[in-house]
A protein has these predicted regions:
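Single conserved hydrophobic/aromatic residue that forms the stacking wall/gate
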Residues: 1-16, 20, 265-266
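Membrane-interfacial loop-to-helix junctions in multi-pass inner-membrane proteins
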Residues: 4, 14-17, 75-99, 159-180, ...
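Hydrophobic or amphipathic alpha-helical targeting/insertion segments
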Residues: 18-50, 61-108
Length: 267
């Protein structure tokens, strides 16, 4: 029997997705009354770069993060082979993350600011970022980052509830999904760096590259630990620690890059 998602989860996921679709529509139709669209788009750009422009900036990338968070929470609500109370607690933690990121976007990174001047054309996206690889790199990378929110929420729920080991199987599945997305995102970024003049080849130990490598290494350790667990409490505690570490590094890396502290040619 397929589980139906809780109504609250469905509402949160629908709201976050609708907000992002509204922003994407503004980019597609070149609505320059939106200041974010004016800053990062142009009416003559190909459709793929209009769409990728939605996440080619700080505000849009935070909205993308929230949208992926809602999608993953929605899919997790269909998870079987896990206790109902444990799943509900995990979704409550996910809802709390939605609230935190939503408040951050509203008060510091609002992508829906109205342009104060009437314009007929936008400034356009940085030409260096108008690349097929870079068009899909951020969503895949963010899917890896945000996927660890599920693993994090499962681990926190495990600290509050004494359950059997079934949650470890679910955590392993989501950690593999997250690590795979993260690997793909890093690989696409490296591919772009390989042929982008002056970037330094496949891997240049650039700070932005290293930021994405940190959760990848922690995620690899988490996957191996989840495959080794056989009821040992010590390994379970290690798994909880790695789950928290992976998500913490993902959040830290995202905000560090998007804050402008690592001001490099990157998105």
């Amino acid at each position: 029997m397929i589980r139906r998602p809780p109504r609250s989860t469905h509402c949160i996921s629908s709201a976050a997705s609708d907000v992002y679709k509204r922003q994407m529509y503004a980019y597609v139709v070149s609505d320059f009354s939106n200041y974010n669209v004016f800053q990062n788009s142009h009416s003559n750009k190909p459709l793929i770069y209009k769409i990728s422009g939605t996440w080619g900036n700080h505000e849009g990338s935070m909205l993308l993060w929230l949208s992926i968070l809602s999608i993953f929470s929605f899919f997790f609500s269909f998870t079987k082979n896990i206790e109902d109370n444990f799943q509900k607690l995990t979704l409550i933690i996910q809802a709390f993350l939605h609230i935190l990121f939503g408040l951050f976007i509203v008060f510091t990174s609002n992508p829906f600011l109205v342009n104060s001047i009437l314009v007929n054309e936008g400034l356009g996206l940085n030409p260096i970022l108008q690349d097929p690889g870079l068009a899909v790199h951020p969503p895949i990378l963010y899917a890896g980052y945000v996927g660890y929110s599920i693993v994090f929420s499962i681990a926190i729920a495990g600290l509050f509830q004494n359950t059997d080991d079934e949650w470890l199987y679910v955590a392993k599945k989501w950690s593999l999904i997250s690590w795979t997305f993260l690997t793909g995102g890093i690989a696409l970024g490296s591919y772009w760096a390989y042929y982008e003049l002056g970037w330094g080849g496949w891997w240049f130990w650039d700070p932005v590259e290293n930021i994405s490598l940190m959760p990848w290494i922690a995620g690899l350790a988490l996957v191996h630990s989840l495959m080794m667990v056989r009821g040992e409490q010590a390994i379970k505690k290690w798994i909880v620690f790695l789950s928290i570490l992976c998500f913490s590094l993902s959040v830290f890396g995202t905000f560090l890059v998007r804050s402008g502290i690592l001001s490099l040619i990157h998105i």
